[in-house]
UniProtKB/Swiss-Prot annotation:
Record HAMAP family: Ribosomal_uS17_B
Signal peptide feature range: none
GO molecular function: rRNA binding; structural constituent of ribosome
Protein's name according to its UniProt entry: Small ribosomal subunit protein uS17
One GO process term, biological-process aspect: translation
Record family assignment: Belongs to the universal ribosomal protein uS17 family.
Gene Ontology cellular component terms for the protein in this record: cytosolic small ribosomal subunit
Segments of this protein annotated with the region Disordered: 1-46
Species the sequence originates in: Mycobacterium ulcerans (strain Agy99)
PROSITE patterns: RIBOSOMAL_S17
Subunit structure, as described in the record: Part of the 30S ribosomal subunit.
Length: 120
């Protein structure tokens, strides 16, 4: 009887240890994997040329409309970006399409895609 009691105790200990091992295997990874990033998507914007004084560079004003978080009023915000214009084709007042690109200089990260509308 003593032998059975000892083996029974060992069996419960080993079962408890096995359950503990099984519980650790059922847990997920130690860290949460990051979601996959969308590849090949560059930002495109439409804006108006405000300066063409630099060589192969234009300054374009981008307009964004944002709703005020508390009052709900639509607010117009503008941002000026420097854009690479290889052929110096755009002039002041032109409506242009831009695309994000790799850094071309200290401040240039956009390139001219096309001139949508010439200034009058």
């Amino acid at each position: 009887m003593m032998a059975e009691a000892k083996t029974g105790a060992k069996a419960t200990k080993s079962a408890a240890a096995g359950a503990a091992d099984g519980a650790s295997k059922e847990k997920g990874p130690k860290h949460t994997p990051s979601p996959p990033k969308p590849s090949g998507r560059r930002k495109t914007r439409i804006g108006y040329v405000v300066s063409d004084k630099m060589q192969k560079t234009i300054v374009v004003e981008l307009e964004d409309r944002v709703r005020h978080p508390l009052y709900g009023k639509i607010i117009r915000t503008t941002k000026k970006v420097k854009v690479h214009d290889e052929h110096s084709a755009a002039g002041i007042g032109d409506r242009v399409s831009l695309m994000e690109t790799r850094p071309l200089s200290a401040t240039k990260r956009w390139r001219l895609v096309e001139i949508l509308e010439k200034a009058k």
